[in-house]
Design a protein with these regions (language model features):
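Beta/alpha (TIM)-barrel catalytic core signal, keyed to glycine-rich beta->alpha loops juxtaposed to Asp/Glu
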Residues: 1-144, 149-163, 168-170, 196
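Iron-sulfur-cluster electron-transfer modules
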Residues: 169-183, 191-195
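Short cysteine clusters
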Residues: 122-131, 178-184, 188
């Protein structure tokens, strides 16, 4: 093929792109996970709730293992100080299959997410798009998922407040752009009340 390598946003708490990464790996391509710590929910400074949910592991360590065990070739660390490299160095050869204990922790994390969000969980299938008003429905509901399921309030508020102010690399329209036209409703396979959820966001 033409490509030998790709970079993707791959995160423990937002695994929507992992199937694409696995396809690339199956095709013999290298895959780099972009900012699995910071953009994945600022896992280097997790909420107490997320810390409790991931026990006995730190959320960042579990996130790195999740990606490495899937075969992801490279993780960008984004260190702000030398000590931030300690965890990465300790996990440099931790690319084997998940242990039963790690699998249990990941399953528990997913179960807790589903319990907390219930029938309002957005599965990030993107069937709701395109929105006539260009509201980035999946991204906004992803932030909602992270806030309510894992109490990542500081991270989600920061990301939301960057909408329309970050240039080409982030969204331009926030939830206020929704005019409740209902165009997205029949396309959602989970029957989410999308305009209502956006209003909460």
């Amino acid at each position: 093929g033409r490509f030998r390598f790709c970079s993707l946003h791959l995160h423990l708490l937002d695994p929507a792109r992992l199937p694409l990464a696995l396809e690339a790996l199956d095709a013999g391509m290298g895959v780099m996970a972009i900012s699995p710590a910071d953009k994945g929910g600022r896992l280097q400074a997790p909420s107490p709730l997320l810390q409790a949910d991931c026990q006995p592991w730190e959320p960042l360590a579990l996130a790195y293992r999740y990606l490495l065990a899937a075969g992801v070739s490279t993780l960008t660390v984004g260190a702000s100080s030398p000590c931030d490299l300690n965890l990465a160095a300790s996990m440099a050869s931790s690319d084997g299959a998940l242990t039963p204990a790690e699998q249990t922790a990941l399953s528990r994390l997913e179960l807790l997410r589903q319990q907390r969000l219930g029938e309002t969980l957005c599965h990030q299938c993107r069937a709701c798009l395109p929105c006539p008003k260009e509201v980035p429905i999946p991204e906004l509901l992803r932030l909602r998922n992270l806030r309510l399921a894992h109490d990542l309030q500081e991270f989600t508020e920061e990301r939301y407040n960057l909408i329309g102010r970050a240039g080409h690399w982030w969204e331009e329209v926030n939830a206020e752009g929704c005019e409740t036209c209902g165009d997205c409703l029949p396309r959602c396979p989970h029957q989410l009340a999308i305009p209502d959820l956006l209003a909460e966001t």
